[in-house]
Amino acid sequence: MATTPLPNALSAYRLLLRATRIAFQGDFTTLHAARAEARKHFDQNRRLGVDTPKHIQHAVETAEILRTNVVQGVRVEGSGEAGKEEQRYELRIHEHIERGDNDTIKTAGNKGIKAAVGKTCSQS
């Protein structure tokens, strides 16, 4: 089984910066904080060591999670019915967000469970 080779540290750092730009586009405060955190971790591990490949792999996996799983919401000002203020949020879903159906989640919990239709718990 072939595995993909790990990028070098600079490539992983650039990959992480691109992922933060995609995930936090339009939110300068969070973008700046995420990039500062990435910089801090890369500076702490500037020297090559035994665990360098592990740190690079962590950066690559973090970038993948940021790019495919982080969705930001922005509060939308709007009036509810009869003067009640309603809290509404607009999600920024970009083309890199992982989309899928819930079929695997719905069927995952049903493995090995037999339910009798029409019976209550006390009748089983």
Curated annotation (Swiss-Prot):
Localization terms from the record: Mitochondrion matrix
Predominant place of localization: mitochondrion
InterPro entries from the UniProt entry: Complex1_LYR_dom, Complex1_LYR_LYRM7, MZM1/LYRM7
Keyword Ligase assigned: no
Keywords, comma-separated and alphabetical: Chaperone, Mitochondrion, Transit peptide
Disulphide linkage map: none
Pfam families per UniProt: Complex1_LYR
Gene Ontology CC terms: mitochondrial matrix
Gene Ontology MF terms in the entry: protein folding chaperone
RNA-binding in keyword set: no
Gene Ontology biological process: mitochondrial respiratory chain complex III assembly
Free-text function comment from the UniProt entry: Assembly factor required for Rieske Fe-S protein RIP1 incorporation into the cytochrome b-c1 (CIII) complex. Functions as a chaperone, binding to this subunit within the mitochondrial matrix and stabilizing it prior to its translocation and insertion into the late CIII dimeric intermediate within the mitochondrial inner membrane. Modulates the mitochondrial matrix zinc pool.
Subunit structure: Interacts with RIP1.
Record-given protein name: Mitochondrial zinc maintenance protein 1, mitochondrial
Organism of provenance: Paracoccidioides brasiliensis (strain Pb18)
